[in-house]
Each structure stands twice: as structure tokens, then as C-alpha cells.
Amino acid sequence: MLTMSELSEVEISEILKDAEDFANGKESKTTEQTFVANLFFENSTRTRFSFEVAEKRLGLDVLNFSADASSVQKGETLYDTIRTLESIGTKAVVIRHEQDRYFDELKDQVNIPILNAGDGCGNHPTQCLLDLLTIKQEFGRFEGLKIAIVGDVRHSRVARSNAEALTKLGATIYFASPEEWKDEDNTFGTYKPLDELVPEVDVMMLLRVQHERHDHYETDIMKEYHEKHGLTVEREKRMKEGSIIMHPAPVNRDVEIASELVECERSRIFKQMENGVYVRMAVLKRALPNVLGGMKHELFV
């Protein structure tokens, strides 16, 4: 589970169905002891802890890896780290890494599933899937929806994964971004001014300003960003009836979105976080039987 590109529409539908079942109260537990390791080389709150909650709800034994306290500090490669975990009996790894496509060196080299929890500016498939679940719960469909992805498109793995998947599922994607943060390589959407999109779209998907990937992050610059490119209270009032606000979080309040809108009636930001657990349960349940005897292996009951 590395990118959204590898999933067909049918596979996406199956994962979302499993996630909906979990959201509706379905329970599933492992029938045998199964170890899963979480390796986060970048800071994370939502993705890391929702994966851990998902793993524990499935009855998995969780190994939380700390790069600072591991042999990575002695020069051990990512490949050797994964092979070590595989050798001691770990059945899957969840990896967040600052390097784009870190998994290219691991594909076809290890024999356990790799669940990509975000690679640099590249991909974030489980974030995309939880966003898809949130949209599906709201509208019951993807076909014909208009989605605005707003903000730092160039540096956003969320923008890439969502634009590709939503286009595949029949939605129309628009981008709104400061000129210096446009991603001309992302061909899944059309750029338009934010104020043109506000009254037209069904989903306003805001992106975090990634100050850790920029050289400057000053209060006055962020205030200007909010006024020009953020979802202000005035812009929210012009949004289409029935439209919703989404954000992958963490939220920079009064930068990407006015603080009072984070939990407004349109906002689904915390619903997205809740859905993250269900989607990650579905992805784990799908990945693990493959390594333990195929999809028919009764690992979960």
C-alpha cells in the first residue's frame, strides 16, 4: 500500500466498504499473535496514533520504532532495518519517511507488507482513503462532484494522492494556490482563483502551509496568506449550500482557515480524523492475510 496509483476503483470501493463497516461498529480481532511495527521518521500525531488505535482494535501487537533510539543512528539503512524486523517475526511495517518514494529501494526486496504513512512530498494513500470515506459519507458518490484543493499544492502529498484518486472516481479537481506553490506536474486538476471556486465547489479541501519545508515562516507573511489564500469567514459565507470544509491537519488556525471555522457546521475536519482509524483498520485487515497465507487466510474473526 504505497500509492493510490496501485489501487483500482474496485479495490478502493472494497477498502471503503470495509472502513464503513468498522465505522458502523463491526469488530474484528486476530486469531493469532501478529506483530506490526510503526516506523515514523517524521513527526506525526494523527497518522501515527490512528494507525496504533487501528492496530490495537484489530488485536495486533504493536512495535513503535524510535529512529533516535535505533541503529539508524549508527548508519543502518532503511532496508536493513526492515529486514531485521522481518527476521524477528514482524508481519507488516507502517512507514512515514521524509524521502520521496523511499519505498522504491524496498519493493520486491522484502517479504512483508509496507503501508506508506506518507513519503516526503510524494504520497499519502491512507490520508486519501480517509478523505474519500468522508466525502462518500457526505454525498454518497464521487461522480460529478467539484473539489477545490487549496494551498501549498507543490509540497503536498495529500494533494497528489487526492487529485489522482478523485479524478479516477469521476470528480472534477480544481487547484487554488499562490504562484510559487503551484505544482505544474500535477495534471489532475485545473488552476483557478480561490474566489471563483468558493461558490462553485462541493468540497473545499484546504492544505497545511508546511513551514518545515520553507525557508521563512513569519507571522506577517502568514496573515497575508490568510487574507489572500485562506478560508476566511467572509469566503465561507459565500460557499455553496451543502458544501463541506476539509483539512488533513494539523491546522494552522487563522492561516489556512479562520479559527472559528475549524469546528463550524460545514467542517468535517475532526470527522476525517475519526475516519482515519476505520480506514487504517481496513487497510491493515487487507494487507496482513496476504503475507499469512493469502486473502482466504482466516487471520481475523
Swiss-Prot record:
Binding site for L-aspartate: 74, 157, 208
UniProt cross-references to PROSITE patterns, sorted A to Z: CARBAMOYLTRANSFERASE
Enzyme class: transferase
InterPro entries: Asp/Orn_carbamoyltranf_P-bd, Asp/Orn_carbamoylTrfase, Asp/Orn_carbamoylTrfase_sf, Asp_carbamoyltransf, Asp_carbamoyltransf_Asp/Orn-bd
EC number: 2.1.3.2
The organism's place on the tree of life at top rank: Bacteria
Pfam entry (one): OTCace_N
Keyword Transferase: yes
Function: Catalyzes the condensation of carbamoyl phosphate and aspartate to form carbamoyl aspartate and inorganic phosphate, the committed step in the de novo pyrimidine nucleotide biosynthesis pathway.
Quaternary structure annotation from Swiss-Prot or TrEMBL: Heterododecamer (2C3:3R2) of six catalytic PyrB chains organized as two trimers (C3), and six regulatory PyrI chains organized as three dimers (R2).
Family annotation (PANTHER family): ASPARTATE CARBAMOYLTRANSFERASE, ORNITHINE CARBAMOYLTRANSFERASE, MITOCHONDRIAL
Record-given protein name: Aspartate carbamoyltransferase catalytic subunit
